[in-house]
């Protein structure tokens, strides 16, 4: 599929891009080549191929969370510079 100048300008307007004349010509060629690759892919027979959304197995690289005992609330509150009941009082961050 060949994209002409008007197609490229339409796409640029949708993307809110301002293009120079040389960019319009270059993008017309590049986008046309890209669409031709997609046309080739459309011709591939995929009968019997199971649809997939992930080609490689998804494995979390994060380690498992482990629950550990925390400090006692009273120990933490006793070290706070200011306290209000069971809360640590800080200076206002926003007005």
Swiss-Prot record:
Its EC number is 6.3.5.-. This is Aspartyl/glutamyl-tRNA(Asn/Gln) amidotransferase subunit C. It comes from Dehalococcoides mccartyi (strain ATCC BAA-2100 / JCM 16839 / KCTC 5957 / BAV1). The gene is gatC. It is an enzyme of class 6 (ligase). Transmembrane segments: none annotated. Gene3D superfamilies: Glu-tRNAGln amidotransferase C subunit, N-terminal domain. One of its GO terms (biological process) is translation. One of its GO terms (molecular function) is asparaginyl-tRNA synthase (glutamine-hydrolyzing) activity. Heterotrimer of A, B and C subunits. It holds the Pfam family GatC. HAMAP family: GatC. It catalyses: L-glutamyl-tRNA(Gln) + L-glutamine + ATP + H2O = L-glutaminyl-tRNA(Gln) + L-glutamate + ADP + phosphate + H(+); L-aspartyl-tRNA(Asn) + L-glutamine + ATP + H2O = L-asparaginyl-tRNA(Asn) + L-glutamate + ADP + phosphate + 2 H(+). Keywords: ATP-binding, Ligase, Nucleotide-binding, Protein biosynthesis. Belongs to the GatC family. Allows the formation of correctly charged Asn-tRNA(Asn) or Gln-tRNA(Gln) through the transamidation of misacylated Asp-tRNA(Asn) or Glu-tRNA(Gln) in organisms which lack either or both of asparaginyl-tRNA or glutaminyl-tRNA synthetases. The reaction takes place in the presence of glutamine and ATP through an activated phospho-Asp-tRNA(Asn) or phospho-Glu-tRNA(Gln).
